[in-house]
């Protein structure tokens, strides 16, 4: 069915509409064989708080951006190759329901749908697209994924030293290896993580010691079930600001 739709006028028109919504700042999305499978608003768990984002699922990429005017204008376009994507379901917790992880070697994050049915449909479609892509290319699924960042609101003190309290002066930082929220003194070192950046990135002392010793796997904790015992406020509707988790700290 996907192959049949690839060259259809309707598919070309739909993709063109998405391109126009992102404007000149967005990347071209129309290429031979690409099909727009579906689209919708998902709540993305960003660094500061959950935020509504517009997502577009194609047969080879996942695209999302900030909502400026619903169905008319989006910005801050992000493009994720599906062949690098792995997804895992997340248990419901408080106001955060119907969620799953989107994991890639460069960036991983949690998203939440409005209903359980919508979640199931998204996950099924993503899994099918990934399976079809890998089958055609003969590649194997990626087993290396960037850590999902712990939201700022989950940590009032450094998650490594357990002593430093965060204030407007004593800022929060994120370890790029484990995703923990840490203080400056606990994250002064940098390490080259090629899948995330061509330059050395900030990591905590704990991960630095393990990486320096060659113990790559121990740095990254398993966090597929819980994100937010402290995120008790209702989900935020919309925001036109940047993704907070794209910041340098």
Curated annotation (Swiss-Prot):
Kindly give the InterPro entries that the UniProt entry links to this protein.
PH-like_dom_sf, PH_domain, PH_domain-containing_F, PH_Phafin, PLEKHF2_FYVE, Znf_FYVE, Znf_FYVE-rel, Znf_FYVE_PHD
Q: Which cysteines share a disulfide bond?
A: none
Q: Where do the annotations place Zn(2+) 1 binding?
A: 158, 161, 183, 186
Q: Where in the cell is it found?
A: Early endosome membrane; Endoplasmic reticulum
Sorted keywords for this record are: Acetylation, Endoplasmic reticulum, Endosome, Membrane, Metal-binding, Phosphoprotein, Protein transport, Transport, Zinc, Zinc-finger
For the modification N6-acetyllysine, the affected residues are: 44
Q: Which GO terms describe its molecular function?
A: phosphatidylinositol binding; zinc ion binding
Binding positions (Zn(2+) 2): 175, 178, 204, 207
Checking SMART domains in the record gives: FYVE (SM00064), PH (SM00233)
One GO cellular component term: early endosome
Which BP terms from GO are recorded?
Answer: endosome organization; endosome to lysosome transport; protein transport
Q: What induces it?
A: Up-regulated by TNF, bacterial lipopolysaccharides (LPS) and phorbol myristate acetate (PMA) (at protein level).
**Stretches annotated zinc finger (FYVE-type):** 152-212
**Assembly description:** May interact with EEA1.
Question: Which PANTHER family is this protein grouped with?
Answer: PLECKSTRIN HOMOLOGY DOMAIN-CONTAINING FAMILY F MEMBER 2, PLECKSTRIN HOMOLOGY DOMAIN-CONTAINING FAMILY F MEMBER 2-RELATED
User: What is this protein for, i.e. what is its function?
Assistant: May play a role in early endosome fusion upstream of RAB5, hence regulating receptor trafficking and fluid-phase transport. Enhances cellular sensitivity to TNF-induced apoptosis.
Write out the domain note. The PH and FYVE domains may be important for TNF-induced localization to the endoplasmic reticulum and for enhanced cellular sensitivity to TNF-induced apoptosis. The FYVE domain is important for binding to the endosomal membrane.
Protein name per Swiss-Prot or TrEMBL: Pleckstrin homology domain-containing family F member 2
Give me the gene this protein comes from.
PLEKHF2
């Amino acid at each position: 069915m996907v192959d049949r739709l690839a060259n259809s006028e309707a598919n070309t028109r739909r993709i063109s509409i998405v391109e126009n919504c992102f404007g000149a700042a967005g990347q071209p999305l129309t290429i031979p064989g690409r099909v727009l499978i579906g689209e919708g608003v998902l709540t993305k768990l960003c660094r500061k708080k959950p935020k509504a984002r517009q997502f577009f699922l194609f047969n080879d990429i996942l695209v999302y951006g900030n909502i400026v005017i619903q169905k008319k204008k989006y910005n801050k376009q992000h493009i994720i190759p599906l062949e690098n994507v792995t997804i895992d379901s997340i248990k419901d917790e408080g106001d955060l329901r119907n969620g799953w992880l989107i994991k890639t070697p460069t960036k991983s994050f949690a998203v939440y749908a409005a209903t359980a049915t919508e979640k199931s449909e998204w996950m099924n479609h993503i899994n099918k697209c990934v399976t079809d892509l890998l089958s055609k290319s003969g590649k194997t699924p990626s087993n290396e994924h960037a850590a999902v960042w712990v939201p700022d609101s989950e940590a009032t003190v450094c998650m490594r030293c357990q002593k430093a309290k965060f204030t407007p002066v004593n800022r929060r930082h994120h370890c790029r290896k484990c995703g923990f929220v840490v203080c400056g003194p606990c994250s002064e070192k940098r390490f080259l993580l090629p899948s995330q950046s061509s330059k050395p990135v900030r990591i905590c002392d704990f991960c630095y010691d393990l990486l320096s010793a060659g113990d790559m796997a121990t740095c990254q904790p398993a966090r597929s079930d819980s994100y937010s015992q402290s995120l008790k406020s209702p989900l935020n509707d919309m925001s036109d600001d940047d993704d907070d988790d794209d910041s340098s700290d």
